[in-house]
Amino acid sequence: GFSLRRGPEPLLNAHPFSSLNPDLVLDAVESTGLPCDGRLLALNSYENRVYQVGIEEAEPVVVKFYRPARWTREQILEEHSFLQELTEAELPVVAPLVTNGLTLHNCEPFLFTVFPRKGGRLPDLDLDTLQSVGRTLGQLHSIGARSRFQHRPRLTVAGHGEASRRFLLDNDFIPD
């Protein structure tokens, strides 16, 4: 890990990404051995921060900064391993780049990953496409069932469906 050009420390109750500025993003990417050309574009992301970063004389990369204290190193590495397994099975996913022999890098207080930039689009929702999406999801689940994840939380009906429903009902979020 490293810490360059970070500026003032964030306030105690500041947003988890308050110290993530453009200089820090570029420094983080360059710490992996990739020479940045200064281009930086923030991309949509729900809970993390994701950027497209220009690389000198190469295609841009996509860099994902994980929300501090949300995921452990072990959980992220388990996800990376699964993405690699899916890639080897020729599923249409994007596995992280290995830079400096690693897929997960540290720039305190952030863990981050570099991905190749891959284009995509929303699928047409015709019957053939829906069947293809269904087959792909089936393959994903089949590959995922080969080994038991040790660190990632399990998505279950009881834990994510019933518990969420109970919370909404118990706290009057759903009108009568």
Where are these regions (language model features)?
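Residue-level recognition of alpha-helical structural elements
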Residues: 39, 126-129, 176
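Conserved NTP-binding catalytic cores of kinases and kinase-like/nucleotidyltransferase enzymes
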Residues: 2-97
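A generic short alpha-helical patch detector that favors 3-5-residue windows
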Residues: 17, 106-107, 156
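ATP-binding pocket architecture of kinase catalytic cores
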Residues: 55-149
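Active-site catalytic-loop/activation-segment of kinase and kinase-like phosphoryl-transfer enzymes
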Residues: 7, 13-14, 153-176
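Conserved beta-strand edge residues that scaffold enzyme active sites
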Residues: 43, 100, 151-154
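Short secondary-structure boundary/hinge segments and terminal tails
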Residues: 47, 104, 118, 158-159
